A protein has these predicted regions:
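Short boundary/loop segments of OB/S1/cold-shock single-stranded nucleic-acid-binding domains
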Residues: 1-25
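Helix-rich effector regions associated with P-loop NTPase G domains
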Residues: 2-3, 20, 42, 60-71, ...
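Structural detector for short beta-strands of small beta-barrel domains
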Residues: 23-35
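SH3/SH3-like beta-barrel fold
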Residues: 37-42, 49, 74, 83
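Beta-strand/loop nucleic-acid-binding surfaces
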Residues: 46-65
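Conserved Switch II/interswitch segment of TRAFAC-class P-loop GTPases
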Residues: 77-94, 110-130, 144, 151-156, ...
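Canonical P-loop GTPase G-domain recognition
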Residues: 142, 151-206
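A conserved segment at the C-terminal end of the G1
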Residues: 208-224
Length: 370
């Protein structure tokens, strides 16, 4: 095994030059264990590494901290293994942290391909798929969708699901598969080349763990059963993990995702909804909100049944969500600035008090102020 097998490239090598002079080694993070990280170096040796205080305190947000898939600089000694720096990410798939906080959650760093696993049954949701496509577009990775468990549905149902997903994003590669039967996986395997990083996302119970087992060639994970009543599966992946596949390629597996919350901007959203963006160029007003505005070409297309009402409503909903996110981020930034200003005042006051105290402790002859 070499660094190239782990996804190393010339850009990482150039950035790492200064760290190499310090005697540190490049490593890719396999796992985040909360208090430590699993890290793999070029010769295949795995280390349990801790984060240096400098890296921790220089991170402005949790998203700036190392995550699974990141490249880091390891300081390896007899006593411990310390992460001294994180290299710049070349791509990053992330979402807004669930809840009301304005925080980014990194799902996988430095990924080339994001594979969304779904099925033609209870998990099928075009609205959720639109969210996935928007986040994948922002990440810079290649979008791939697996309509899995084809053995449980008719050919017509699988074909319809695949066609509807393809219509949302003509650039995405959509494949109909059955991991259990081993059908439809040839196209996916062709993506798994040396140094290429692929991450799996999707709901619980859609077959991600079974796919990992098949790609690794053994029963790597326990695979949960799906409730026949609800159609939902139990989580079989409890933490994100990066794995080097036997036949080449790198796989980052993720626990089932329940909430696909936006972490992006309006520009990325419009790029993901190119059909609406092209229509908006025909609107009467440049700042048309595509609501009740006069001369809205987008709403006109909906009325003429040239644009799906569901897609139109989905766009408006995501636009509102992104606007809400922007307000949350602005509010959070103001809070951080106030906190920083307060901390600065406290430090200044403490320094002044300390200097005054030291002045009082000096011998009287040294207290004269010149």
């Amino acid at each position: 095994m070499t660094l190239l097998d782990l996804g190393w490239n010339d850009a990482f090598e150039a950035e790492f030059a200064t760290y190499r002079e310090l005697g540190w080694e490049p490593a890719r993070l396999l796992r985040d264990n909360k208090i430590s990280y699993g890290a793999l170096v070029g010769d295949g040796e795995e280390y349990e590494a801790i984060l240096s205080g400098k890296v921790y305190h220089e991170a402005e947000t949790d998203a700036d901290l190392p995550a699974v898939g990141d490249w880091v600089a390891l300081d390896i000694t007899e006593d411990d293994v310390v992460i001294r720096a994180r290299l710049q990410r070349q791509s990053c798939f992330s979402r807004k942290t669930p809840g009301k906080s304005a925080e980014e959650q990194v799902i996988a760093a430095n990924v080339d391909v994001v594979v969304v696993v779904t099925d033609a049954g209870t998990d099928f949701s075009l609205h959720r798929m639109e969210r996935y496509f928007t986040l994948i577009h922002r990440s810079g990775a290649r979008p791939v969708v697996m309509v899995n468990k084809s053995d449980l549905f008719t050919a017509a149902e699988n074909k319809l699901a695949a066609e509807q997903i393809q219509a949302l994003n003509p650039e995405a590669e959509v494949m109909i598969t059955s991991v259990i039967k081993g059908t439809g996986l040839k196209a996916l395997r062709s993506l798994l080349k040396r140094g290429v990083t692929l991450t799996l996302i999707g709901s619980s119970g859609v077959g991600k763990s079974a796919l990992v087992n098949r790609l690794l060639g053994d029963e790597y994970q326990w695979t949960g059963e799906v409730n026949e009543v609800t159609g939902k599966g139990r989580h079989t992946t409890t933490a994100r993990e990066l794995m080097i596949l036997p036949k080449g390629g790198i796989l980052i597996d993720n626990p089932g995702i329940k909430e696909v919350q936006m972490w992006t901007d309006e520009t990325t959203l419009r790029d993901s909804f190119r059909d609406l963006e092209e229509l908006s160029m025909q609107c009467k007003f440049a700042d048309c909100k595509h609501g009740s505005d006069t001369g809205c070409a987008v709403r006109g297309a909906v009325e003429r049944q040239e644009l799906s009402p569901a897609r139109y409503e989905s766009f408006l909903k995501l636009e509102d969500e992104i606007e809400g996110l922007r307000k949350l981020c602005r509010k959070r930034q103001m809070t951080l600035e106030r906190r920083a200003k307060r901390d600065h005042k406290i430090k200044a006051r403490n320094r002044s008090d300390r200097e005054a105290h030291e002045f009082q402790l000096r011998p009287r002859k040294d207290r004269e102020i010149h």
